[in-house]
Amino acid sequence: MVSVSNERPGSIIRWHYLWYVAAALAVMVVAIAIQNLWLLNYVHVFSSLLWTGIDLFMGFVLGPILRRADISARREVMRQLTPRTLFLMPTVSIVAGTTGWFLAVQLGYTALGWPEYGWVAAALLLVTLMTVLGLGFLTPVNVFVCLELQKANADLTKINGWMRWYFYAVATQGTMQIAIIVVMTRFRTGI
């Protein structure tokens, strides 16, 4: 068991980020409620770009680097990164998926027949899998890591075990993000 002893770091969870979560959810609700196609599309594209870009960066750039980094460097990166992703990633995934559904309804994609509806079904399947993976695994791991890093003697072996699975899950998420880009470009060019 590897432990690092230092001063008690205090709370690393940045609770004030909940204001940003509330603001993002409010913008989403407004975009859906006023049924403005441009605003709904903007919120969907913006949140989807954030979700996709961060997933791809984390899964294919940062993950491999951290797996090879010194344990103290990994700890510091996790202490800085985890609190930021704790609220950001669930929020962008919820906003992207929800606005995507309402956008599909507003554009008539949900009324398509087969085989065209297969593209809609593929998008729904991918978003559902990514959201379940994100909210059901990645977010809890983020919470566990945050709580462990707040301890004076954080168990880095335990954290490394969680983070190993975390980065594999993020790489899986990134692969699904690439698949959904294929589906979205099909929507954009016409089904």
Question: Where in the sequence are the language-model features?
Answer:
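Polytopic transmembrane helical bundles with strong interfacial aromatic enrichment
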Residues: 1-191
